Amino acid sequence: MAVKTLQDLLNEGVEGRGVLVRSDLNVPLDDNGQITDPGRIIASIPTLKALVEAGAKVVVTAHLGRPKGEPDPKFSLAPVAAKLAELLGRNVQLAGDVVGYDALSRSEGLTDGDVLLLENVRFDPRETSKDEAERGKLAAALVELVGEDGAFVSDGFGVVHRKQASVYDVAKLLPHYAGTLVAAEVDVLAKLTDNTERPYAVVLGGSKVSDKLAVIEALAPKVDTLVIGGGMCFTFLAAQGLSVGSSLLQEEMIDTCKGLLERYADVIHLPRDVVVADSFSADAESKCVPANEIPDGWMGLDIGAESVDRFAALLTEAKTVFWNGPMGVFEFEKFAAGTRGVAEAIVAATGKGAFTVVGGGDSAAAVRALGLPEDGFSHISTGGGASLEYLEGKELPGISVLEDTAPEGS
């Protein structure tokens, strides 16, 4: 990645300068507004801490959830500000708006080493606008908060696949740098696409084939093993002519799955047994059945023990592993064994020297929810969608804009 990094900025000197940081602080909250998984906040700390210690006036912009372009208290970054302050060991101011009077007045009052978190950037409809001029106006307002001699650090890998004001347009207006997290993420993903050590195994789960089709098409010709579990496996099983009962099924994708199974018969591995339930609930009646014996009215919610053993045998022999998507409904204890078993096999592969990557999103959440050791994987990505789009070979706007060395008008 031919871009300037945070270290380049620190070498240039940031004491007394305003630095705008786009972090990914989009963490899950419970019904009481409490953070249930602070993983992304924790991942943002190294960049912020380095800037604080170097004496920068740090202004952080980020989003939470999907507000509809206007302020919504349930999507406020207030709990995030409190967690940031705890992890940084210093006060973090929270602006009452995105780029309004409060944000501007607080930014003008910053002293060296201070941190200001702007309110949820998606409270401003211009952030996600398709109109470049509208996004540009918000970007210009963000720049005003750090001044013309300021800098922009892109450290939110989970959003680099979005062409949004705080991710893309602002980088055109300021000297720009990849933060510690973004630089590390891209370096890791490059290892999954360039001169990858074999055997190379990919594990894909999740609910919909349509969500993973592009990455299957991109990776199937390049890998030795492609394990498919989760809700999406039932569309593949249906493509083999099997009855899947009331399991999740994308009928419009059956022919596509047939084609994939024909082309990559030696690469794609499907479950041979599944755990089925009579309803979608934590206390449903459940049983393990062969994949070709799913009863009518029952739905598959996890892969079975035989499948876990088969997949584990493949994964523990791999030298490179990429995992994206759970094997079942791991949030329900009855249907967590498949995800746990596959994850433990990947940890075992890591222990044998394999390079293993968890592709963000639900997979990263599963690692934490199931109490698995995070250091049992070579890397846990903070960006599920961005990881997939990178592996699909798509351009990531928030990365490509960093490769332009000079801001507009300089």
From Swiss-Prot:
Keywords: ATP-binding, Cytoplasm, Glycolysis, Kinase, Nucleotide-binding, Transferase. Substrate binds at residues 24-26, 40, 63-66, 122, 162. Pathway: Carbohydrate degradation; glycolysis; pyruvate from D-glyceraldehyde 3-phosphate: step 2/5. Coiled coil: none annotated. One of its GO terms (molecular function) is ADP binding. ATP binds at residues 212, 300, 331, 360-363. It is an enzyme of class 2 (transferase). CDD domains: Phosphoglycerate_kinase. It catalyses: (2R)-3-phosphoglycerate + ATP = (2R)-3-phospho-glyceroyl phosphate + ADP. PROSITE patterns: PGLYCERATE_KINASE. Pfam families: PGK. Its EC number is 2.7.2.3. The keyword Kinase applies. InterPro entries: Phosphoglycerate_kinase, Phosphoglycerate_kinase_CS, Phosphoglycerate_kinase_N, Phosphoglycerate_kinase_sf. Monomer. Belongs to the phosphoglycerate kinase family. This is Phosphoglycerate kinase. It comes from Nocardia farcinica (strain IFM 10152). The lineage of its organism: Bacteria, Bacillati, Actinomycetota, Actinomycetes, Mycobacteriales.
